[in-house]
Amino acid sequence: MSNAEHSSNFIRNIIIDDLDSKKHDTIITRFPPEPNGYLHIGHAKSIVLNFELGKEFNGRTNLRFDDTNPIKEDTEYVESIKEDVHWLGYNWSELHFASNYFDEMYKRALLLIKKGKAYVCDLTPEEIKEYRGTLTEPGKESPYRNRSVEENLDLFERMRKGEFEDGSKVLRAKIDMSSPNINFRDPIIYRIAHASHHNTGDKWCIYPMYDFAHPLEDAIEGITHSICTLEFADHRPLYDWFVKECEMENIPRQIEFARLNITNTVMSKRKLKQLVDEGIVDGWDDPRMPTVAGLRRRGYTPKSIRNFCKAIGVAKADSTVDYQMLEHFIREDLQETAPRAMAVINPLKLVITNYPEGKSEILEIENNPKDESAGKRAVTFSREIYIEREDFMENPPKKYFRLFPGNEVRLKGAYFVKCNEVIKDENGEVTEIHCTYDPETKSGTGFTGRKVKGTIHWVDANNCIPAEFRLYEPLILDDCEENEGKHFLEQINPNSLTICKGFIEPSAKDAKPQDKYQLFRHGYFNVDPNFTSDDNLVFNRIVSLKSSFKLK
């Protein structure tokens, strides 16, 4: 981290104070995802924050799966999360599952009952909600609140044995139904769920609630700084209450920071799952998705995501980050590393009528104009080439400097060509254009006889590779996740994906999935790992070449 990033990271300052005061000898942080979906860019921010803090202070960072809800969780998500954390460049100190602590949590729940701090409640979910009260009205005590310790122990044991139906009973903490903090109004700490668990199978039919389980997990693992997002700030007193009343030996500290919001991006796992389930996208790794898997398939690099997460900093108030900031960091990374190539994604044939038939020559084109050490690559040139259809207009507007009848342009790395004839089909659509070239104007010869204002790219029609190019726009039209109460599905961009069939120069013949290229004038592209095969080369556009965005 830079000094600016350090000074703005209030969590880092808390850790420094704790270490200086000898409150802790070392720090232990954790990343605790629930395995009920794929990680997204917001989770990446938490991953980077926790692991970088652990690394900076020579501490440890655990990966813990908060798997306390068997109905929504799956091993598919466990494996994808582990893959994503590794891909981002991090190795956890210890791997844990909350479900491995179920026995210990059960013992602590028994302790609360014995202390008169928990009771079994028979109210329905609707009644519990009604009894809870509101922000302006206190709650009402459950008629089951004053059951004896013995009765509560008996009922809780029978809950564990599976004698009761789902939803018929819960275990609640006995705190204060009139507390101004609604989270203190006798929160549920165990519910009945007759469902197989991905890790514990059918051993349990009662499962702890997040507010109860999470502080115990942190305490069991000796976590020193439990870092979470701002929506848990009101839960912190309850977090501390459970640690104290359950008589945990280690006392972790919960610290909240602002979650990541990005323009034109849905960050809710529930909504992302809806996009997948309803077929609006083609899976969790669709390149339009903000999931780590989607960003990886799109072509984002671990370095670009880490740098983005570090640059946005750690704040105490929610804000929204411009999506262009994320794009800035992938451009910055690939500008230095991506090999260059020419590709035509919407091809129009150009015939050079005065170029000898059957002739082919090899031209040398620089790989990176900003880096001479990158060298040059060989590209063939012949009588027939493809150019972009948008690089020709029969009746152009003013200040259009590309090809039109009578105009001359430079072909990148080759010659000047002038348009002399336009060929059309029976519908009046241009099918090819005929040009003449000037052999004296070859690039690299030092020709200065005249200048042209336009340079366009091309590929040799006799030596190129067919390819599919997938061009992406934001999946969400509006700048915020919810706009004036609109359902987010009403904001889906119908033009978020455009598929083009074109050609790329032969230097890409050995391209492998996840290889990245800068395609001249088009942007940065990634070879798609899902759709690419030996006879079908598919490129995802990661980002365009330029943006008006300026990093402050």
UniProtKB/Swiss-Prot annotation:
A motif ('HIGH' region) lies at residues 33-43. InterPro entries: aa-tRNA-synth_I_CS (IPR001412), Gln-tRNA-synth (IPR004514), Gln/Glu-tRNA_Ligase (IPR050132), Gln_tRNA_ligase_bac (IPR022861), Glu/Gln-tRNA-synth (IPR000924), Glu/Gln-tRNA-synth_Ib_cat-dom (IPR020058), Glu/Gln-tRNA-synth_Ib_codon-bd (IPR020059), Glu_tRNA_lig_a-bdl (IPR020061). One of its GO terms (cellular component) is cytosol. L-glutamine binds at D66, Y210. It comes from the Bacteria. ATP binds at residues 34-36, 40-46, 229, 259-260, 267-269. It is an enzyme of class 6 (ligase). One of its GO terms (molecular function) is ATP binding. It catalyses: tRNA(Gln) + L-glutamine + ATP = L-glutaminyl-tRNA(Gln) + AMP + diphosphate. PANTHER family: GLUTAMATE--TRNA LIGASE, GLUTAMINE-TRNA LIGASE. Monomer. This is Glutamine--tRNA ligase. It comes from Clostridium perfringens (strain SM101 / Type A).
